[in-house]
Structures are given as C-alpha cells and as structure tokens.
Amino acid sequence: MNNTPKFNFNKELLDRFINTAQPYFFPTDVKKSKLKLLILILVSILSVISISHFFIIFLGFMLDTFFPKFTNDLAPNFKIYVNSLKEPNLIYLSLGVLSIGIYSFYTNLKHLQNRYRPWLLLFIIIILLFSVTGLNVGLSYIFRFLDTSLNTREEKVFWDFLWVYGGAVLLAVPIIAFYRFTRLKFGRYWREWLTNNFISRYFNYRCYYLLDSNSLNSDIDNPDQRISEDIKHFTSVTLDFLIDILYAILTIVSFSAILYSISKTLTLGLIIYVFIGTWIAILTGKKMIRIYYDQLRLEADFRYSLVHVRDNSESIAFYRGEKKEVNNVLKRLFNALKNFDLLIIWQSIIDLFQFMYSNLMRFPVYILVAPLYFAKEIDFGTITQAWIAFFQVFGALSIVTNQIENISSFAASIFRLGNFNEMLNKIPDEEKTNNRINYLISNNVSVDKLSVTTPGSDKYLIKDLSFDLINQNLLIKGESGVGKSSLLRAISGIWTMGKGEISKPDFSNIMFLPQKPYMILGTLEEQISYPKQQGEYSFDEIKEALNKLGLEYLINDHGINSTKDWSRILSVGEQQRLGFARIILNKPKIAILDESTSALDERNEENAYKLLKDTSIAYVSVGHRSNLNKFHNLSLELTKNGSYKLEKI
C-alpha cells in the first residue's frame, strides 16, 4: 500500500516548513506568532540596511580624509553617491528604521528568552551578506575600469585600479571566510536545538512507543532517520536557501540598476526568459519531490533491514534463515535502486534543461551589447560590467531553476519532518481525550470497571474488569491474543486506550520485566541500575543484588565498568535473572512480570519470586506454567470477547 501523500509547492508545504522552523526563533504558542516572527525578520533586514547607510557615509569620510586622490580622481561618482546619502531626510529615515527595529525586539523580549543566539547570528549573517554584495558591486566597477584602461592604454589608471583591486581582495577574504564560518555555526546550533526539541517530544507521552506500535499512524516510517538525518538536512538546506534568496534579492536590487542603465531591452528580456524557465522548473520539481520522498523512505527501509539482521543474528543463525534474509535485504535494495533509476531519468532531463537554459542566455548579451560598443555608445569596460551585472541578475533570478533538484529533495524532507512534527504534537492531544483509562495514585493496585481496547478501534480485549490487590499477588492466564500483555501494559500506564479506572503507585515505583529484558548500551553497573543513573548505588549494593540471583560471576568475568553488548553476551536466562536483580536493587512497590521466568529452571524461578516476597515487592505476573500458582494467591484467566474469570488460588 502506498502511503505517499500528494506533493506540491503549496500552502501545506509552506505551513509545515514554518511550523518546523519557527520554534527555534520564536515560540509558536504566542498569539499571532507567525506575523511577529515575520516582522522581526523584516526589521532585522531593514536595520542592517540602515546600518549599511551610515557605514557607507563613514567609509566615504575615511576615504576622503586619507585617500582624497582616490575619491577625487579615480572614483568621483562614489563621492557623489556618498554625498547623496547625507540628505537629512535619508538620515532621519535610517534612524527611524533603527528605532523601530530596537522597539520591535524590546517588546518581544519575554518571547525571545533563550533565543538570543539565533537572532544574533542571523543579524551577523545579514550584515556579512550585505558586505559581500557590496564587495561584488564594487568589484564590477573595478573590473570595468581595469578593462577600459587596458583598451584605452591608460597605464597609470590601470595600475591605480590594480592596487585598488588588491586592497578589495584583501578586504574580501576575511569577510567571506567569516561569513561562511558563521553560516556553518548557525546551522550547527540550529540542528542541535531542533534535534533536542524533537527527541524530548519523541520521549514524552511515550510517543516512541505509540509510533512503534503503529497505534496512531503507519505513515511515520523510520523516525530514527527523521531525527538523525532529516533534521540535519532541514537545518543546513533551510539556512542555505533563505540566505541564498536574500542574497539573490540584494543582487537583483544592486545589479539591475547597472544592467538597466546599459540596456533596458536586455533587462526586460532577461526577466521574461527567467520567468519561463522558473515555471518549467516548478512543473518538473513537483514530480521530483515525490521521487525524492520515496527515495528517502526506501533507503531507510533498506538500512533498517540490515539493522534488523544485526539485532536478530542469533535467531537467524538457529533457523538457518540466511537465504530468506538475503532475499528480504535484496528486495529492499531493489526497490531503492528501482526508484533511483527513475530519479536518474528525471535528473538527466533537468540537467539537460538547465544546460540549455544557462548557455542560450549568452546570445542576448552578445546581440544587444555588441552593437552599442561598435556604435561607440559604451566603452570596452562597460561590456565587462554588463557581463558581470547580467549574470549576477540572471543567477539571482534563476535560483529556482538552478536549484530545482535540491529544492525537490528539500521539499521531500519538509514533508517527512513536517509530518513527524505534526504527529508529535498530535499524540499528547490524543492522550488527553476522554476515551482513555483514568489513573489514580495509590500504594496498591486496584482496577475498577476497566475495559481495554485495541488501538484505533472499539474492539474490547478486556471488558468491565475489577479487582483489588491489597496484600495479594495476581497471576494472569489465558490463550495467546486474549489481552494478557495488554492488561499488564494498562496497569503499567503505557497502554491507555480504553475506559475505567486504575489505581497504582506512581511510575517511579513500578518496574516492568518482559520475557526478554531490555539490555541497555552501557556498563554492567548501568545495566543493573537501570532506569536509575550510574552512581545511584554502591558497589556493595550492586554486588549483593547480583549475588542473590547467582550472577556475581559477571563482575569477575566482565568487570562492573566494562561496556559490552549484553544482549549478545548473556543468555536469555541470565538476562531474566539480571532483570530480577534490577528489581531487587531498585525496590519498586510493584513489579509487572510478563512471562519473566520463561527461560529459568524451577530453582532459579522459585528463588526470583522468593526474593520479591522477601523484599515486600508486590507483583502481577503473566505465565502459563502450573508451578507459578504457588507464588500467587489470586488468578485471573482471560478469555476471548473480553470476558474473564477471577478466583482465589
């Protein structure tokens, strides 16, 4: 079944982008948050323009003071331009814009707490971006004067401007280097913040569990990839695109005037040509988004199939299932490569279009500018400047056409990450709805009129169950599929679908031990202390807990601080005993045991249950063995259609 959504460059894509990107800069729970964010970005840009205004005036003053020959003889037009910026109305306008910018940020200070870094870095990047654009404009004039002086054989002017060019390069190198460094650091900080944000929400309200159990939406495939890779791609590409768009706008504004002064026809023709090219690129981009989306999903499926083999290598080896696993892995590889073949075709089509689009634009420049030169209406240096201005504007206007492959890939990431973001926001709301089990805090476990349903349906696994476990231990029995494990999960508080009331200790006083205990990636000390942090228990306490379960040899064989793959080193029986050692060490009020002694012999099983009784830990068990009866005093047998039988043992 294909769950791929419909893709388009539309409002849905824009909304998902904003909802994912905005929280780093401005909280989403503020009234009119999107409008306020837009205003802050605009006033930041306008404030930089105002600062640039005053900087150019200052630069003109410094050049006129220390290099009067340059401003009077070589660049008189620059001096005229600087003097025009000294108009009182322009000065007042820039001061007003700066005041509005300061006021806008001041009124939103309470919303920008812990968000000073992104705004500071963004402000620095915008300043550097204006500086780079200014350098490009200045270099276009320098190249113009250099070529004109060569053509007219004005040696002195040539050498003077060559020195100016050298100075401009020396000035440009640190600015460009710092500009690129700041962009990369901004992306790094954004990725760190957004990843932490997603991870914290992923572990809240058991989202990781609900998504994995497919109880809400099967479209959220490979959340690990979305967190680790899609966020990285989103932050880096978003930053690149937004800065490139701003740079394109500055370039268009800066160089269009130069191009328009040389040839109005060339400027108009360029705009029409770019509009047609962009329209064609967007049409092809719609198809590319779907292909990129599928490629990300299929590559993740292929990678997961290899991880699945690694995690289940022993079972595969016992079953001699190598041939089947090879077929499964290669099937996923084939699906990824098949989609990649389609991607190659469309990439080739777009590459051909981009090549023709870029190279055909050389003809208008030759056709329209050359006659002006032959008619002696422009000098030779103006041709060079026309080339520079034309291709600067052409590149800026063609940002969509030239980047359509990256934009399509980026849009696919937005859909994946945006969908994941929406689901992480939806789950807490789902958990707060009325069709959920009501939980109360109590020292004992009691259930009142409890009905447990399957995810996304009204089918009852258990209906109207009531019992009280004061000084009693419960054994749950029944055929496979009648809801035994679901009831344990409901009592634990991780399965909330249904109705009724459960009273139980808080989460810190409940421990769950499944048939195959969870082995964390850590040391032996971390393993037995889990879920508490390392250092919570002394070495003697840990050693005593292991000794009670007959596992003291693990310290001698492996060391307490050695990090190993415990799920592979230990047998299932050893893992189950280690799980009981965790319970003995952590001393919860109640233990939830889901066939937790299935791999133990009778001696170790009896020892484990005896330790629970000796430490006054109440427990609820699921099991099939008849010898489990002696460890419990209450039996609950579940049958199909939600019915049950509750009796004393």
Each language-model region and where it sits:
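Primarily ABC-family ATPase nucleotide-binding module
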Residues: T71, A75-K79, S215, D219, ...
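ABC-family ATPase nucleotide-binding domain "signature/switch" substructure
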Residues: Q527, N561-I649
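Loop segments that connect adjacent transmembrane helices in multi-pass transporters
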Residues: I291-L342
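Cytosolic ends of transmembrane helices, especially the final helix of ABC transmembrane type-1 domains
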Residues: D294, L298-F302, A317-G321, N327, ...
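A hydrophobic transmembrane-helix motif
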Residues: I127, L171, I175-R180, I243-G285, ...
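Conserved "ABC signature" C-loop
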Residues: P517-D565
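Membrane-integrated ABC transporters
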Residues: M1-Y165, Y179-R183, Y209-V237, F241-D244, ...
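Helix-to-loop junction immediately C-terminal to a conserved catalytic motif
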Residues: S492-G493
